[in-house]
Amino acid sequence: MKKLLLPIILLNFSSIAFAQEPKMLPIGFAPGEELLMDSYLKSRVSRAPITTPPTLPVRTAAQWEESQALLITWTGFPSIHRQIIAAAQLECKVIIHCADSNVVKSDLVANGVPLTNLKYIEVPFNSIWIRDYAANTCYLNDVDSLILVDWIYNRPRPDDDDIPLAYSSFLNVPLYQTEVAPNNLMNTGGNWMIDGMGTAFASELILEENDGAGAYSIAYPNHTSTVIDQIVEDFHGINRYIKMDVLPYDDIHHIDMHMKFLDERTILVGKFPTGVSDGPQMEANLLWVLSNYTDPWGNPYKIVRVPMPPSTSGAYAPSASYRTYSNFVIVNKTVIMPVYRQEYDTTAVRIIKESMPGYKVVTIDADNSGANLISQGGVIHCITHSVGVTDPLRIVHNYLNDTYNSTTPYQIDAIVQHKSGIANASVYWTTDTTMPYTAASMTLTGATTDTWTGYIPAQPVGTQIFYYIKGQANSGKQQVRPMPAPAGWWKFKILGTVSIEENLANVFSTSVFPNPSHGLTCIPVNSNRKLSGKLYITDVTGKVVQVVHTGDFKQGGSNYFINTSEWTSGVYTIVAETNEGVTAQKLLVK
């Protein structure tokens, strides 16, 4: 695959991994490694059987889809690996790449970890960072055939580069590689965030490492952004590749160190104290994304913020290791996340649990003496990868928002797919999660799009409805979404009907946030019908400091964004002036 004809110095370096427990390599370049990249890349010879794009439509799976296996490489941090294995083996197989399986088994037994649901591949390796060098789960025709897609790894570590060939062969899954021109592409799993519907996020590292020079003064690969987009569309089915500016203090420029898709509509994003570390660039990137992109259904992305914790001394990058809570892995119904210190961990765990109801959240301390994984530049997501199931039953749903409708049923549409076809689907709903759910049958309403439709009966004003969707394939396989259902669910609330005066008041039915503000700030605007007007902000003298929006306010909810990082501290007024009147809300800028 990737290591033939290598220089002698590189071969000697890589062979350490199999001969003995390897010296720990960081997630970034180790001293001297960058100098090896030129000769390493020039000498690469692919051993993968498939280096051309799939001929059938391809879709890259999201992390919340069903996994058959979690992947790790056993080296360097056995105490952390034990905890990952103990949590993941309850959800799926754990495939352990290792030098000696007997050593691994003895360690697990000695520390009380069952040897159940585990598979071992004895294979040479260079490092622990399997997220970056493993292949990605994709499906042909949405759900029909499982394949794996691998890229050129951006480190001169040939044994790591061969890991995808080892486990794809072990699982008997076809392996595609972007190894051969004109489809040669360098990429890394930490800089790859997928929604399962054709959208990918990345930092502009993807451009830097494929511009013909990169950091290595080499002429390979050499692609424009347009060509890169075409390669990921051909191999991954990605039709929207969103590339953000790199963060100045995240040395590896992997976005999994500060953000993560929680579902198709929701993005978890780290939050630094105002003006600190990568905070300003992170806020600017987020504002740019929200101003230019929507979720697959045209809704503004729902953003969940989680604090970026400091070091024990209170320092942030570049004066300390880059600690983050977003670097977790979703393994079917379990979230395995890094933690650091209780004073920050409690808030982060609460945010994850509230944002992903029903998921079991397992925490692993990555900042302990003797197990200080974060000091190496990555955490849990960085040292794990996954392989999807061979027969996914896929359910995709644009979940309902709060509504003023209390008289007509609530339509539930979902894409439900399986390679054997779908026998039936139902929506289950309740107004009290301590009580049983009621099933409502769904019918196939879009044969070409695999869309199924059902209805929840109308409910009185003030009711909160919890619901999930279940599908059954012709093969008999069943699946629910959200996957932890009925413990997990979507929810929406029935709001009251309003008069003109009340409708005007409801323009700001949700408060601006964060408030106080210093940086990216969201102004939610809501209306139960279309209104015309403008949204602007005044200072204490009444002077207009920014016009945010002029024109129509659509029915329902819209989010508008401002950046107050350069504003003078004080009290400002956000004004919504419509054809039905004026309403206002105070904003404090720190």
Which stretches of residues belong to each language-model region?
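Bacterial Sec-dependent N-terminal signal peptides
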Residues: M1-P22
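Short strand-coil-strand connectors
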Residues: Y139-D142, M197, N474, E577-G581
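Generic detection of short hydrophobic beta-strand segments and adjacent strand-loop junctions
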Residues: I72, V304-V306, A440-M442, F492, ...
